[in-house]
């Protein structure tokens, strides 16, 4: 909701007279909140499906937008196939039916670093080692906690519009478009766009800068010049490949 001109979560108590306007998925802020919350639901469901025996060996990566959804991979398991997709999707719907509260918790930054290490979220563990603030807000769904840069839905009950599709060794988390919030469009493969975006991801992986935390490490080690030189080499090679195709 908007408290005057400030965006606030629904759990926020109003302390005095003000003008309120409720935000929906027709608003950009509301639409982003819905998509962010569904991503949290997806990651929680993946962790529930794989169990708690080996969380540090499994890494859920939400890579990039692809049409109305996000392309995601789950690293550290034998195979991302139809059975795994079905189990995750079923678990997501179960969590929706349970209307689990999505709560915000203020914890010490050092505690957050330890938490992300236990979950195997080493990218966020690295990121928070650079955080100057002594405390951080995390969102929780039952015992599972994670960090997000924006507001969340108050509970899982309204996160019922989504679909999962197997694609290129990963999963597309498909969600409604902004102008049709109660309809999940069919996933239409975008192979050319996928190849370009995947190549960008590979470039980051090859340089060891697949996350912001990793990039911070490189900056503190004074390796920015090397990063720029390698990126320029990648670009020159790509331009050469395009020239060959034209010729």
Regions found by a protein language model. Name each.
Residues 1-10:
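Short acidic beta-strand-loop surface patches of small beta-rich interaction domains
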Residues 37:
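TRNA-recognition modules of translation machinery and tRNA-sensing kinases, especially anticodon-binding
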Residues 12-33, 45, 53-66, 71-246:
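Auxiliary tRNA-acceptor-end handling modules of aminoacyl-tRNA synthetases
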């Amino acid at each position: 909701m908007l408290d005057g001109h400030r965006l606030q979560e629904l759990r926020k108590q109003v302390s005095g007279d003000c003008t309120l306007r409720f935000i929906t998925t027709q608003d950009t802020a509301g639409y982003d909140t819905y998509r962010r919350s569904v991503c949290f639901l997806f990651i929680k469901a993946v962790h529930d499906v794989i169990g708690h025996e080996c969380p540090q060996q499994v890494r859920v990566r939400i890579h990039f937008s692809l049409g109305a959804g996000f392309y995601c991979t789950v690293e550290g398991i034998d195979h991302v196939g139809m059975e795994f997709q079905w189990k995750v999707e079923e678990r997501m719907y179960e969590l929706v039916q349970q209307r689990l509260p999505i709560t915000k918790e203020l914890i010490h930054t050092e505690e957050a670093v330890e938490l992300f290490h236990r979950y195997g979220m080493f990218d966020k563990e690295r990121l928070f080692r650079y955080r100057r603030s002594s405390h951080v807000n995390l969102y929780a769904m039952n015992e599972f906690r994670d960090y997000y840069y924006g507001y969340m839905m108050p509970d899982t009950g309204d996160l019922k519009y989504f679909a999962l599709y197997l694609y290129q060794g990963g999963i597309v988390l498909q969600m409604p478009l902004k102008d049709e919030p109660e309809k999940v469009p069919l996933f239409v493969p975008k192979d050319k766009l996928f190849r370009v975006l995947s190549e960008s991801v590979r470039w980051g992986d090859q340089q060891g800068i697949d996350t912001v935390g990793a990039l911070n490490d490189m900056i503190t080690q004074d390796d920015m010049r090397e990063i720029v030189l390698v990126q320029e080499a990648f670009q020159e090679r790509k331009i050469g490949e395009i020239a060959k195709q034209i010729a």
